[in-house]
Amino acid sequence: MHEQRRGIVRVDRFLELHRRLLVGVLVAILGGLGLSAGCLLVMTRLRARASAEVTRIAREWDVLRKPDNTVSASGHEVEGRGGSSIRAKEDALLARLESCASSPWRDGFAYAYAQACVADIFFARKEWEKAQQAYVRAAYGARRSYVAGVYYFNAASCADERGRFEEARELYQRSARVQDFPLVPRALFNVGRMEEALGRAAAATAAYMQLYERFPLNGWAALGKSRAIAISVGGGRAQ
């Protein structure tokens, strides 16, 4: 009991001697929390504003890319697909998207969606390399979502169009590793297809059979198995 009293006295004396210091520390902590909350609020508003802007741009792009469209999102007449007026409007949309994607953070809906819209525009133009790069950036921004699988898959398609089969194979593999991505069998089939394009028959056969073992009831797996059989019948060559 005596020791407890001594302890209480020591604490009281410490608080009395260092009261100003403790008050200063408390004020600093509260001020820091207030500043953090303020910064968080500002960032949240900026993200919401960027998301709304990207959504508006995406709607304008949807109107602009319609094959039978003769009127732009702003109501002005435009030339046919590929015309200078259409391209100029696409360039304007790209500039706005780049502004939305140039924020200090590199994740979240606004960044990923902006990069995906950039990729879609370049994909429509068949500018495969630029589209591929933008899809990869979109996948990074959406890395916590299954949507990343979609973006990696699209990036792989761009690499495939460019004849960059090794890049395409790697990107298809990335898409297949994304959790909850619904097109995993199709992505894995394309891994085998890229191995075939690279002339690696054994690797292609292995990829197709692994696909079949993982998803035996899937249509892509059945097609993969038939490709593996065709390679085997062809003596290690694609048929």
Swiss-Prot record:
Organism of this sequence: Treponema pallidum (strain Nichols)
Main location: membrane
Keywords assigned: Cell membrane, Membrane, Repeat, TPR repeat, Transmembrane, Transmembrane helix
Disulfide bonds: none
TPR repeats: 112-145, 149-182
InterPro entries cross-referenced by the UniProt entry: TPR-like_helical_dom_sf (IPR011990)
Keyword Translocase: no
Cross-referenced PROSITE patterns: TPR_REGION (PS50293)
Organism lineage string: Bacteria, Pseudomonadati, Spirochaetota, Spirochaetia, Spirochaetales
Entry-linked Gene3D superfamilies: Tetratricopeptide repeat domain
Segments traversing the membrane: 21-43
GO cellular component, one term: plasma membrane
Lineage top rank: taxon: Bacteria
Membrane topology field: Single-pass membrane protein
Protein name as annotated: TPR repeat-containing protein TP_0282
Subcellular location: Cell membrane
